[in-house]
């Protein structure tokens, strides 16, 4: 865009008059006015070049507001893991893990573990957002995450730590239907949701009961 602008500047009436007069007197040095005008044109082209690069360079970090904007414009994607890639069991908050018998080779993941992993990963695009939030909210910052971000981070973490054929227990998840749906759309199908007796009639439990995926403890 800035390259196309140069010919238009050179064709302006002022520029044509100044340059045409000097072409007939090649032996005369350029006037200060001519040098100044050429310098201004060069500066304008340089500024346009920088603006163009800034607009087109890849986005490596997100602020809180930018994440909300991105999330609001996202369309449904292909999930990270295909159906049957994992044997995935989600364990809601309130279930005593000592009542569960984890297979020796099972991978046990907590959302807090995934979020902290990326808060401490300086080259991750969510590093700035998470640390800004941490500075404002302290240890309770996870409760203030933008809608949907916890699911995004859990998915990224599982992509790094899990592989096809793994048995995975995701603790303290999901807390609500919105996160459950987003997770199944973007990360992986959930094979079983383990809920405490106190939540047997909760919204998440009712949702997964329709597909016979609830186990109450």
From Swiss-Prot:
Keywords: Membrane, Mitochondrion, Transit peptide, Transmembrane, Transmembrane helix. Disulfide bonds: none annotated. GO terms for cellular component: mitochondrial membrane. Residues 1-26 form a transit peptide. It comes from the Eukaryota. It is found in: Mitochondrion membrane. The chain crosses the membrane at residues 34-50. It is a single-pass membrane protein. Its main location: mitochondrion. Belongs to the AIM36 family. This is Altered inheritance of mitochondria protein 36, mitochondrial.
């Amino acid at each position: 865009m800035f390259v196309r602008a140069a010919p238009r500047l050179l064709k302006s009436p002022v520029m044509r008059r100044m340059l045409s007069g000097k072409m007939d007197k090649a032996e005369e040095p350029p006037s200060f006015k001519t040098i100044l005008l050429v310098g201004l044109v060069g500066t304008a082209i340089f500024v346009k070049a920088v603006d163009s690069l800034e607009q087109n360079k890849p986005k490596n970090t997100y602020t809180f507001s930018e994440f909300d904007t991105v999330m609001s414009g996202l369309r449904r994607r292909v999930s990270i893991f295909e159906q049957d890639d994992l044997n995935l069991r989600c364990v809601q908050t309130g279930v005593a893990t000592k009542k569960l018998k984890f297979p020796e080779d099972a991978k046990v993941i907590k959302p807090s573990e995934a979020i902290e992993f990326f808060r401490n990963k300086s080259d991750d695009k969510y590093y700035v957002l998470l640390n800004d939030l941490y500075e404002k909210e302290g240890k309770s910052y996870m409760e203030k995450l933008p809608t949907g971000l916890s699911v995004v981070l859990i998915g990224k973490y599982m992509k790094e730590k899990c592989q096809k054929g793994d048995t995975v227990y995701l603790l303290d998840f999901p807390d609500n239907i919105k996160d459950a749906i987003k997770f199944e759309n973007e990360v992986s199908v959930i094979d079983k949701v383990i809920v405490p007796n106190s939540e047997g009639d909760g919204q998440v439990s009712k949702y997964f009961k329709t597909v016979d995926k609830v186990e109450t403890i």
